[in-house]
C-alpha cells in the first residue's frame, strides 16, 4: 500500500512555494509520493481567467522534473466541467484501491471545508493535510493533520503581477518555468526569449546577454 499525497491547484504558474510545501509534507508524513493535480476549472475560480491547461501542465512538468517522488496526475485536466475534489478522489480511489490518499490544502482553505462539495462523503475517502500559515485559523469540525512548513511570501498571483510589471521572477520559480514564461509570453511578459534571440542579430552574445538578463 502506498501513501499518496495529492496536491491540487491551478499552478498558474507553479513556484518554489508549491515545491517546498509538497516536499515538507512528503517528509513530515513519510509519504510514498506527491501527486500534483492541476485543475481544469476550480469551482472557486470559475469566473476567473486561467492560463491554458497545456501551458500550466508544461510548467508543472518543468517544475517537478528531477524529483523522484513528485509526479503529475492529469485526471482533472482530462475531465470536462468544474474540478470537484470529491469526484476526483472517488475516481482515484477506484483506480488505486490499495493506496491511501492524503489531500494537501493551505490553512486558508481549512475554514472553508464545511462548504466543500459532498464534504461528509469526501472525508471518508481521503485524509486532509492542512499546511499552517500565519494569520489563518486551523479550526474546523473535520479531521485535518496539521503540518508546519517554512514560510515564504510567494504566490502565483505575485508571480503574474511581477511579470506584467516587467520585474524579475528569477529565484521565485524554477529556471525552466521562468524561461517557459518568457518564451511563450505568458502573463503579459514583455519580451520572450525567442524575441531576444531574433533581436540580437549580429550583436555580440556577451553584450546582448547583458542587455537581455531578465528580458530585453
UniProtKB/Swiss-Prot annotation:
Which NCBIfam families does the annotation name?
A: cyt_tran_rel (TIGR00125), nicotinate (nicotinamide) nucleotide adenylyltransferase (TIGR00482), PRK00071.1-3 (NF000840), PRK00071.1-4 (NF000841)
Q: Which reaction does it catalyse?
A: nicotinate beta-D-ribonucleotide + ATP + H(+) = deamido-NAD(+) + diphosphate
Q: What is the recorded function of this protein according to its Swiss-Prot or TrEMBL entry?
A: Catalyzes the reversible adenylation of nicotinate mononucleotide (NaMN) to nicotinic acid adenine dinucleotide (NaAD).
Q: Name one GO molecular function term.
A: nicotinate-nucleotide adenylyltransferase activity
GO biological process terms on file = NAD biosynthetic process
Q: What pathway is it annotated to?
A: Cofactor biosynthesis; NAD(+) biosynthesis; deamido-NAD(+) from nicotinate D-ribonucleotide: step 1/1
Look up keyword Transferase and say if it applies: yes
What domain of life?
Bacteria
Presence of the UniProt keyword Zinc in the record: no
Q: Which cysteines are joined by disulfide bonds?
A: none
- One family from Pfam that matches here is CTP_transf_like
This chain belongs to the protein called Probable nicotinate-nucleotide adenylyltransferase
E.C. numbers: 2.7.7.18
What keywords tag this UniProt record?
A: ATP-binding, NAD, Nucleotide-binding, Nucleotidyltransferase, Pyridine nucleotide biosynthesis, Transferase
Broad EC category: transferase
Protein's organism: Geobacillus thermodenitrificans (strain NG80-2)
- Sorted alphabetically, which InterPro entries does this protein's record hold? Cyt_trans-like (IPR004821), NadD/NMNAT (IPR005248), Rossmann-like_a/b/a_fold (IPR014729)
By sequence similarity, the record places it as follows:
Belongs to the NadD family.
Q: Which gene encodes it?
A: nadD
Amino acid at each position: 500500500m502506498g501513501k499518496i499525497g495529492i496536491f491540487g491547484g491551478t499552478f498558474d504558474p507553479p513556484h518554489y512555494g508549491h515545491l517546498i510545501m509538497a516536499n515538507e509534507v512528503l517528509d513530515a508524513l513519510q509519504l510514498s509520493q506527491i501527486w500534483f493535480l492541476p485543475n481544469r476549472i476550480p469551482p472557486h475560480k470559475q469566473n476567473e481567467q486561467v492560463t491554458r491547461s497545456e501551458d500550466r501542465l508544461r510548467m508543472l512538468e518543468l517544475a517537478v522534473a528531477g524529483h523522484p517522488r513528485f509526479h503529475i496526475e492529469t485526471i482533472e485536466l482530462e475531465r470536462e466541467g468544474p474540478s470537484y475534489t470529491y469526484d476526483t478522489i472517488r475516481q482515484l480511489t477506484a483506480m488505486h484501491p490499495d493506496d491511501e490518499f492524503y489531500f494537501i490544502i493551505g490553512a486558508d482553505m481549512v475554514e472553508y471545508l464545511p462548504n466543500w462539495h459532498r464534504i461528509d462523503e469526501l472525508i471518508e475517502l481521503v485524509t486532509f493535510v492542512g499546511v499552517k500559515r500565519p494569520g489563518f485559523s486551523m479550526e474546523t469540525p473535520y479531521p485535518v493533520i496539521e503540518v508546519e512548513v517554512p514560510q515564504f511570501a510567494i504566490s502565483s498571483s505575485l508571480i503574474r503581477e511581477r511579470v506584467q510589471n516587467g520585474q524579475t521572477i528569477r529565484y521565485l520559480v524554477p529556471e525552466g518555468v521562468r524561461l517557459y514564461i518568457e518564451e511563450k509570453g505568458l502573463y503579459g511578459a514583455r519580451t520572450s526569449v525567442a524575441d531576444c534571440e531574433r533581436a540580437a542579430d549580429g550583436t555580440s552574445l556577451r553584450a546582448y546577454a547583458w542587455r537581455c538578463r531578465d528580458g530585453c
